[in-house]
Design a protein with these regions (language model features):
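Hinge/cleft segment of the Venus flytrap/periplasmic-binding protein
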Residues: 9, 13-14, 172, 277, ...
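Hinge/beta->alpha junction and helix N-cap segments in small-molecule ligand-binding domains
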Residues: 44-50, 73-82, 127, 139-148, ...
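Short, well-structured alpha-helical segments in soluble
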Residues: 82-97, 208-220
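Hydrophobic membrane-insertion alpha-helices, especially the h-region
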Residues: 12-27
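Flexible loop/hinge segments that line or gate small-molecule binding clefts
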Residues: 108-144, 255-263
Length: 326
């Protein structure tokens, strides 16, 4: 776990805000030369990561269709909703008319967003701000987490002749605290236990440089289930280097990196949420709100696709692969 001192956090936040000044100023000056479009700030952690490629492409396509100006803001090294809220408030001061945010979950996150939503429309993407999705006051666009893990287990069943009784499993998620993580972990454990499988270990957290070593030291299992894109990539890397003791890897992923490990056989199957659709729907609903739609913004659930190595480059998957590569 990385522990930031108060001074380091302050410096990081100042750097992020400084970069944001340049990005927003340049973007808004450009738009004034053309036409006064609505300005939508999109706040994502590690926004340059490939896991967001499909999402950003969907946001960009919708912003062009809806004639909105999109500015993507990264929250790299920002570990709390307080800091994320400061970045959003700064974006508002610089002219943002609405915000789409992947929130950093926390006990006070919903309350912090209230001061923002009182000024401009706020749409969440990927997870709610708190730990209980049903109690969230904000519209969220995301895949059905319970459906994703249920499908993941079904794919394992297909490869094991419909019977996984006595088979051993490891469960890995890089996302620590979101409501989506709780739903995924709870759902996959319930499914496996119901079918008589044995869960030997659960691993949670972004493992960074030590990831391969930590994974390698886990008890050998028959199957490793990875519940998000980063964990797919880390487990796929470990599998490729023969450091997972022969375990089959199945995962929920949406980046070209995840597909790479599927293509080379390190991952057996991917369940891919429609991140393009999530981005497109988010932006469309936000701009409709800015254009005077009096209806409350609503939760939106996107679909998913199952892809395997044998059909990776099929005609059905060509569009999906194209979107991932944008």
């Amino acid at each position: 776990m990385n522990i930031h001192s108060g001074t380091k956090k302050y410096i990081i936040l100042e750097i992020v805000l400084g970069i944001l000044v340049v990005v927003l100023a340049g973007s808004m000056l450009f738009q004034k030369k053309e036409k006064e479009f609505y300005k939508v700030a999109v706040v994502l952690p590690d926004s340059d990561s490939r896991q967001w490629s499909s999402l950003k492409y969907g946001l960009r396509m919708a912003s062009e269709d809806c004639e909105a100006n999109m500015v993507v803001i990264s929250t790299d090294d920002i570990a709390s909703m307080e800091d994320e809220a400061s970045i959003i408030q700064f974006a508002i001061k610089k002219g943002a008319d609405a915000v789409i945010v992947k929130p950093i979950p926390g006990a006070d996150s919903e309350e912090l967003l209230q001061t923002i939503s009182a000024k401009i429309p706020v749409m969440l993407i990927g997870s709610s701000a708190g730990y209980n999705r049903s109690q969230s006051a904000y519209a969220t666009t995301e895949a059905d987490a319970a459906a994703l893990v249920k499908q993941l287990v079904q794919e394992v069943l297909k490869d094991y002749g419909g019977d996984i009784r006595g088979k051993t499993f490891g469960i890995f998620s890089s996302d620590v605290a979101s409501d989506v993580t709780y739903v995924k972990k709870g759902g996959v454990c319930s499914e496996l236990e119901r079918m008589g499988a044995q869960i030997d270990w659960k691993l949670t957290g972004n493992l960074n440089e030590d990831g391969l070593t930590i994974l390698e030291k886990q008890k050998p299992v028959d199957v490793v289930l990875t519940l998000d894109d980063r964990s797919v990539v880390q487990a796929g890397t470990c599998s490729k280097e023969n450091r997972l003791h022969g375990a089959d890897v199945y995962g929920i992923g949406n980046s070209t990196e995840s597909v790479y490990y599927l293509d080379n056989g390190s991952v057996k199957c991917l369940v891919v949420p429609d991140e393009f659709g999530a981005g497109y729907q988010c932006m469309t609903q936000v701009v409709h709100k800015l254009n005077g739609d009096i209806r409350k913004m609503e939760d939106q659930t996107v679909q998913y696709t199952v892809i395997r190595r044998s059909e990776l480059f099929s005609e059905r998957n060509q569009e999906l692969l194209f979107i991932m590569s944008q």
